[in-house]
């Protein structure tokens, strides 16, 4: 096998997550109450001069955490309080429940930034004016946000972050996919600072001891979509048979690398079809049992599953990060961002040529060719 050194930085994927398509409801806009009457909007803890960054997401954990890192970075730079509002999560069937404390331990500070992340978010309100300016509208006008507005806000937030300047607004609302809007150190700070709830961590540790510890584990994440609009990931699935061959090739290449222990493959996917096909090709592959949607029926995780869907997702996300080698297909998926930052060896697919593999090891990159 030849390794061709790649001097350019890792590809900056500009994928738009399916979460961008979610329409807003009055339940989800109740956090921010624009208009006059500032005194009625004061936080319980402070004055009308307090300033905030509100990180609001309802999508998968990868997008939620990456976008949270971008919001945290801005809060850190500007001395603001960070509020985490994950109501309406795709992992819960309770729209008024903040998903963050359901899945993660409470945290009051992240890297010197004060954090609000409890379920009292329903009773809190934040002082105006707001940025982006759309949030200064009366609450009734905030019931629905068209896709164009969400994308516009994403770009406005990106410009604000890139400017390295603060906003005159008292509250900055980050309610868009903010992948690639912060440096890796900000992402690492988030993952170091927040911890899954003890019952989730216990599940992760138990599976690791039994199925991972005796082996050099190759973690394989395959984001298929199962009929969902996967948007930025779609080019990787333009030809399903070709995509599966690329995955098989990546597994073979990963197995051919040096390993300290006997090799075991661990598959995480949102598609029963992918699990079936990969298991036929590699009968020894290991997967955690979970409930799949019917073929082409849409996303793996949805509110009807309740919190168990979130427990399952976090278990796989954190186990992937503890693998010796991780294969990311496609590399545009935020679900494996944690693994990308912490796994010792990662294999990705070239954005411009998905047939080519990129080996990332010890912070260096190489193109893999057989």
Curated annotation (Swiss-Prot):
Establish whether keyword Metal-binding is in the entry: no
What's any GO biological process attached to this entry?
oligosaccharide biosynthetic process
Cite the GO molecular-function annotations of the record: hexosyltransferase activity
Q: From what superkingdom does this record's organism come?
A: Bacteria
Q: What is its EC number?
A: 2.4.1.-
Query: Which of UniProt's keywords are assigned here?
Result: Glycosyltransferase, Nodulation, Transferase
- Which residues does the UniProt record annotate as the domain GT23? 47-361
Transferase among keywords: yes
Disulphide bridges: none
> Which family does the entry's similarity section mention?
Belongs to the glycosyltransferase 23 family.
Function in brief: Fucosyltransferase which adds the fucose moiety of the nod factor on its terminal reducing N-acetylglucosamine end. Uses GDP-fucose as the donor group.
Q: What is this protein called?
A: Nodulation protein Z
Underlying gene:
nodZ
